[in-house]
Regions:
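Short, well-ordered surface patches within globular domains
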Residues: 50-117, 174, 180-194
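Short, contiguous strand/loop micro-motifs
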Residues: 48-50, 150
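N-terminal Sec-pathway targeting helices
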Residues: 4-17
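Bacterial N-terminal signal peptides
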Residues: 15-25
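A well-ordered secondary-structure block
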Residues: 107-193, 197
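Short, low-complexity, disordered segments immediately C-terminal to signal peptides
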Residues: 33-45
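N-terminal Sec signal peptide cleavage junction
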Residues: 29-30
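Low-complexity, Gly/Ser/Thr/Pro-rich intrinsically disordered linker/tail segments
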Residues: 197-204
Length: 204
């Protein structure tokens, strides 16, 4: 009997960047400039971000989306989370934002490097995993007045919510999240010194 060849499927849509509106005001005057509240972002204290908690918040929100669309929840996978964290850290430390590293390695390479095997058959196709990435920020906006920066900081909850909202508004990322055959995911977060929050999501 002839053997049917199975197709292989790797899924990685383009990365998503949440942009920060920047404003700058520079004044030259003899007297100190009064601080007008309507010129400045809403004053919030700088958030304390617990990366592990943020990852779990994103994971819970992802499962909320799946449940709302009649899908089963997916389990947290520590091995996938380690792979995701490594990619988020690599993007932050080497100043790039892409599924492929500067050496041209995509998530399938990262799975193999860590000894992670993903193979989910559906019909004639074997799905080998998927990846979403997003670049978020610690703050919504920054206004500089006479050289002094005023930040509208984001809370940890808001970072999680805007991350999932951003993915769900992007067709490719949304499709990855809502694919019915995934059973596991890992979320990896790394915060760069400049306030950029790199987030990687890996599926199997």
């Amino acid at each position: 009997m002839a053997r049917r060849n199975k197709k292989r499927s790797w899924l990685f849509p383009a990365g998503l960047v949440l942009l920060i509106p920047l404003s700058s005001f520079l004044f030259f005057c003899a007297e100190p400039l009064p601080r007008r509240s309507d010129m400045l972002p809403e004053q919030r204290s700088k958030p304390r971000i617990v990366v592990a908690d943020l990852e779990q918040q994103i994971h819970r929100l992802i499962n909320n989306e799946r449940k709302q669309h009649g899908l089963h929840v997916i389990a947290w996978d520590d091995a996938l989370a380690r792979i995701a964290r490594q990619h988020s850290r690599d993007m932050a430390m080497r100043s790039y934002f892409a599924h492929e590293s500067p050496e041209g390695h995509d998530f399938s390479y990262r799975y193999r490097r860590e000894g992670y095997r993903c193979a989910i058959p559906t019909g004639t196709t074997v799905h080998l995993g998927a990846e979403n990435i997003l670049q978020n920020n610690l703050y919504d906006s920054v206004v500089t007045v006479n050289g002094e920066a005023f930040y509208a900081w984001n809370s940890q909850v808001k970072i999680a919510e805007t991350t999932v909202h951003g993915w769900m508004k992007s067709s490719g990322h949304r499709q990855n999240i809502l694919r019915p055959y995934w059973n596991n995911e890992g979320i990896g977060v790394f915060i760069a010194p400049d306030g950029k929050v790199y987030i990687t999501q890996n599926f199997c």
